[in-house]
């Protein structure tokens, strides 16, 4: 996800760039806002840049080969240093002792991200099949 794909959010992009330029990136950032505000897209674009994708011709990586490799992994949201945690549901018919983790829905999560990064919780729940329960 590149920053040029993020709609609006110019001030937020500027502040994120400032954090990078000043080498003052905190250990955690929370991207919040109403549905449709682009918080997911902005967070994904920033994570992609931190993991090597180019932003205005710059990258956190030093070689073209490393950048190309990182960009290929990020295009499928499968970079080894990119981790997601998201709401899950217990599969229909699962026992009470069944432990559900985000990894159980990784394929569906990547499918959602590949389609459009502007989605709602309701759309995510539908993709997981929550409306059938």
Model-derived regions: residue spans:
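Clamp-loader machinery-focused feature within the broader ASCE/P-loop NTPase space
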Residues: 2-133
């Amino acid at each position: 996800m590149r920053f040029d794909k993020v709609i609006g959010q110019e001030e937020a992009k500027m502040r994120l760039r400032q954090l990078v330029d000043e080498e003052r990136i905190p250990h955690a950032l929370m991207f919040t806002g109403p549905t449709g505000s682009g918080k997911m897209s902005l967070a994904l674009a920033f994570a992609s840049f931190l993991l090597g994708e180019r932003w205005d011709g710059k990258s956190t990586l030093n070689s073209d080969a490393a950048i190309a490799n990182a960009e290929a992994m990020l295009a499928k949201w499968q970079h080894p240093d990119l981790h997601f945690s998201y709401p899950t549901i217990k599969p229909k018919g699962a026992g009470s002792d069944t432990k559900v983790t985000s990894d159980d829905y990784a394929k569906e999560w990547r499918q959602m991200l590949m389609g459009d990064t502007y989605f709602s919780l309701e759309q995510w729940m539908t993709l997981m099949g929550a409306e059938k329960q």
